[in-house]
Regions:
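Metallocofactor- and cofactor-centric catalytic cores in central/energy metabolism, strongly enriched
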Residues: 3-36, 43-53, 58, 73-82
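Short, charged N-terminal beta->alpha structural module
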Residues: 5, 119-142
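A short, well-structured beta->alpha microelement
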Residues: 23-25, 140-157
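Structural motif
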Residues: 45-46, 120-126, 167-171
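Long, charge-dense
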Residues: 55-95, 99
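A short, charged/proline- and glycine-enriched loop
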Residues: 108-118
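Short, well-ordered secondary-structure micro-motifs within conserved domains or adaptor modules
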Residues: 154-171
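Conserved small/polar residues in nucleotide/adenosyl-binding loops
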Residues: 176-180
């Protein structure tokens, strides 16, 4: 679901002329980085970084304990909303993986499932995980987190899954059967 807070950095021609767009973005990120409200702040650049002059890699990785994730999603290179969400999921998983590699992290709220789990990546309707879970159950599998995740700890659970199911109208599957 799209129940996430969305902020933006207002800018005008003065910002562009003075070349302060990156500074304005950096200041806005510092303002937003309140650990009482956010686990992470994702900054999305919808332009090519070299053209926009917004080098998101120069933002800090963390401010006040809030993760800062910069992603470049150029509009002409990423044609659909779903694919942009895949880029977001990849950036979030990469950040979470680095945290896991650095040391202990919080356990997912529901704990670890006793069955192998399948992370689900892509466009999902609210009932989809339950229906998919019911289909996986006879195989001894369980539905894992949906990515992009609503809660940061779900990313750690996704990294612990046995496999990923790419659920997306643009993903296709080729089934291979060996000749008998």
């Amino acid at each position: 679901g799209a129940r996430r807070s969305v902020g933006y950095v207002p800018f005008n021609s003065e910002t562009l002329v003075t070349g302060k767009l990156f500074e304005d973005i950096r200041d806005a990120v510092h303002e937003l980085a309140d650990p009482d409200h956010y686990d992470a702040v994702v900054v999305t650049n919808l332009c090519v970084p070299t053209a926009s002059g917004v080098p998101l890699r120069l933002l800090p990785n963390e401010i006040n304990g809030v993760r800062i994730i910069g992603i470049d999603v150029p509009g002409f290179g990423v044609p659909t909303h779903a694919e942009a969400k895949d880029i977001l999921a990849g950036a979030m998983l990469n950040f979470a993986r680095q945290e896991v590699e650095a040391g202990p992290v919080q356990s997912p709220k529901g704990g670890k499932n006793d069955r192998p789990t399948i992370a689900m990546l892509g466009e999902m309707f609210p009932a989809d995980p339950m229906v998919i879970g019911a289909m996986l159950d006879p195989m001894g599998l369980a539905a894992g987190p949906v990515l992009p995740a609503r809660e940061w700890r779900e990313l750690y659970a996704a990294l612990d899954c046995e496999a990923v199911a790419a659920i997306h109208p643009f993903y296709t599957c080729l089934l291979y059967t060996s000749p008998s």
